Amino acid sequence: MEADFVIIGSGSAGSAMAYRLSEDGRYSVIVIEYGVPDVGPLIQMPAALSFPMNMETYDWGFSTEPEPHIGGRSLVTPRGKVLGGSSSINGMVYVRGHARDYDHWSESGARGWAYADVLPYFKRMENSSGGQEGWRGTNGPLYIQRGKRDNPLFHAFVEAGHEAGFEVTEDYNGEKQEGFGPMEQTIHNGRRWSAANAYLKPALKRPNVKLVKGLARKIVLEGKRAVGVEIEAGRSFSTIRARREVIIAASSINSPKLLMLSGIGPAAQLKEHGIEVVADRPGVGQNLQDHLEVYIQQECTQPITLYSKLNLFSKAKIGAEWLFFKTGDGATNHFESAAFLRSKAGVEYPDIQYHFLPVAIRYDGKAAAQSHGFQAHVGPMRSKSRGSVTLRSANPREKPVIKFNYMSHEDDWADFRHCVRLTREIFGQAAFNPYRGAEIQPGAHVQSDDEIDNFIKEHVESAFHPCGTCKMGAVDDPMAVVDAECRVIGVEGLRVADSSIFPRITNGNLNGPSIMVGEKASDHILGRTPLARSDQEPWINPRWQVSDR
């Protein structure tokens, strides 16, 4: 079996590349996917989002090694093992990231990935409803919507931010990210609008695209050129040949793992596992980054939250309405208000993100208290902590060793203390007076730095945004894995294009930026001239040097 291009992974970037590389019919594409089909309400119903990421059917089941700076806790690292990859199990929140994130990419060695370069690709991929005119795409495959925001708590959150002196923004994905405003969702006609729905399924209707189920074991190399992929399907092994290129889009966990299994990575580590070294790239698996967050929860004095919908009868009613009509409480992820804020004067652009929910709920989807409540998910966006993904063995079926080194930089603790206190300030504004009850978490007794630190150590969780393990950079950067056209340095015919190539984590959720990577990488792979650079300038708070708001 062979094709012009062989893509490993049907996730956010992989699906986009399958669509674009096959678009004009000149080239054949094979997509290798180990996961299951994305069928059923647990995947497609937006409100069911807490289920697929906690089910081994749809998730690779990764977790970290015990993290020493948060009391030895091991945190889960969900990655989608399903058509659409993590875009089929995520929270459906759409965030481009801030313009300065991409300017930093370019300045750090990823030339051609500044905001002016990537904005045209965001526009090409978007089909935005309600976004800022002139800044958003309206004809792309990826549908983006805003929720109805029919719960008054969503508006109280935004008004409270305004009362506290912060900016308000009507479109954080437009000219102005900073401020409080509506959150955007990858939902269309009441369904999760994953990369599979947006890109892969339309591509699979073309005669030049084929989906192959199997586990990618290693890249097949002839000398220093990639010529195919060895896969395992059932108990049989086979090789899929690539006439032109192999493209890895297997996630920030599996992409570096696959490179290392193929002899591309830190030489000493490869030799330790008996793997022949093809290219000594010490950066493979390094530079691992993520966003962490905590939940700040309040009781609500009015019975207007989703707490009343958590009983079995209400869930059945919600499910039935969604199954028959794709409407109602099942047709939203319930993340409908958000904020991007700067932590202090001297910070040029937002470094704190908020998701607001009109319910107080735990990570497993159960009520945090036997009462009505609401909560904010809050965390810093640019932690200095860095981790790694390394091989546990040379067995492709064995999970890698994942160490994020969460909270290992002293700034992380100060940042999170500020997040907790800032959220209390926001919840204490007059806009919440009609609704605010007692604080559920951390609790009113948690006040001092030590008390807040202990709360963080026990309760901080991943926002599930791992990235950076195959860093894009200049070819003379010893820690770069791919160049600015996503080509693996030192190997021909091989690229990586997914969130693993991010030099630094972007400001917000990563599905949107990962799809953008797939879009832009496609033009590089096809040898096309990149889309014309944008001359639009993002809004930067004129008071950023003297005020945090």
UniProtKB/Swiss-Prot annotation:
Pathway: Amine and polyamine biosynthesis; betaine biosynthesis via choline pathway; betaine aldehyde from choline (cytochrome c reductase route): step 1/1. It is an enzyme of class 1 (oxidoreductase). Its EC number is 1.1.99.1, 1.2.1.8. The active site is at H465 (proton acceptor). Signal peptide: none annotated. Involved in the biosynthesis of the osmoprotectant glycine betaine. Catalyzes the oxidation of choline to betaine aldehyde and betaine aldehyde to glycine betaine at the same rate. This is Oxygen-dependent choline dehydrogenase. GO terms for biological process: glycine betaine biosynthetic process from choline. PROSITE patterns: GMC_OXRED_1, GMC_OXRED_2. One of its GO terms (molecular function) is choline dehydrogenase activity. It catalyses: choline + A = betaine aldehyde + AH2; betaine aldehyde + NAD(+) + H2O = glycine betaine + NADH + 2 H(+). The keyword Disulfide bond does not apply. PANTHER family: CHOLINE DEHYDROGENASE, MITOCHONDRIAL, GLUCOSE-METHANOL-CHOLINE GMC OXIDOREDUCTASE. Gene3D superfamilies: FAD/NAD(P)-binding domain (3.50.50.60), Glucose Oxidase, domain 3 (3.30.560.10). It comes from Brucella anthropi (strain ATCC 49188 / DSM 6882 / CCUG 24695 / JCM 21032 / LMG 3331 / NBRC 15819 / NCTC 12168 / Alc 37). Keywords: FAD, Flavoprotein, NAD, Oxidoreductase. Its cofactor is FAD. Pfam families: GMC_oxred_C, GMC_oxred_N. FAD binds at residues 4-33. HAMAP family: Choline_dehydrogen.
